[in-house]
Amino acid sequence: MLESSLRLRGKNASYRIIQEVEKRVEPVTEKDVTIVLPVLNEEDGVVAVIDDIRRNGYQNILVVDGYSVDNTVAAAQAKGVVVLTQHGGGKTGAIITAIESVSTPYLLVMDGDYTYDAADIQKFLAHARNYDEIVGSRKSENISRLHRLGNGFICAFFNALIGTNFSDVCTGMYLLRRSAARHLVLQSRGFSVEAEILAQMSMLGRATEVPINYRTRIGKAKLVTWVHGFEIVKSIIALGRLYNPIFLFSFTAALAAIPGAAMLLWVLWMWLNGFGFRTGWAITGEILVIVASQAFFVGTLALLLKRSELRIEKVVKEGIGSG
């Protein structure tokens, strides 16, 4: 009886300690975050985005312009927000400029075309203390079928190479911890910068995602589906070479199974139809299939090791954080 009572008291004491710790950890508020709008010729949407942000209670707004040739800058300045001209090319230059310029502990990036809902910002702030990056996973209602298909392929490819489980790596709305973001080394130039940031944050920090709304954009779309999709895939391959090279090269070598199997099927068809047995082609096909099988095994092992490494890193970081 005494033992049970002591055990119960111990549990209550632990619970009170947890409550006290939670009280001391101040939540992230609107004063702790700067909303960053990278823009290029967004005169049709930037004013609506700024109004939407302010309507939801956020006043720290930074517009980073990529040398617009329309009235984007004038429209943003007329709303009384800070407007900077980016250095460096593409969207990457805008993100780097923002990271160097903001003074708040967090920055939240969202496109200036009104596709993202400022009401969702609170979802990011609710988890900001525990993560270096939080990405917004878009609902698919206003995303075209072709874009959904491409995004699904890109996400699957990204997750396989990096060892993660994200549902939207191409999203244009995400929160960054400024102290962690300043350690990013960004090399991409276009829309693939989001995938590059997420890869580095996943490997070197902590990242998660929250569900967000996605609206029809205001103004003309700049995204050319196939061109930018290819750029993103190319960028992810480059990231794979850096963060998980064994899996990437093994996966590439495993593709040798396709011509190898084709050769063996052709040899079998020729033999069954009385055209003789093609020994040279059969040996070549067998070699390709064997090499591909071994590469697939090595790639699978590399992927398992990478995921184990990520789990260990996560446990270590959580231990350091709690200590």
Predicted segments with their positions:
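Acceptor/aglycone-binding surface of glycosyltransferases and processive sugar-polymer synthases
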Residues: 86-89, 93-101, 106, 118-191, ...
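Acidic metal-phosphate-binding loop of nucleotide-sugar-dependent transferases
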Residues: 114-115
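A conserved acidic beta->alpha catalytic loop
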Residues: 65-73
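Hydrophobic helical membrane-anchoring modules
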Residues: 2-28, 195-323
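Short hydrophobic beta-strand elements that form part
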Residues: 34-38, 62
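Short, well-formed alpha-helical segments that are part of the catalytic scaffolds
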Residues: 41-55
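Donor nucleotide-sugar binding loop of glycosyltransferases
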Residues: 42-45, 68, 91
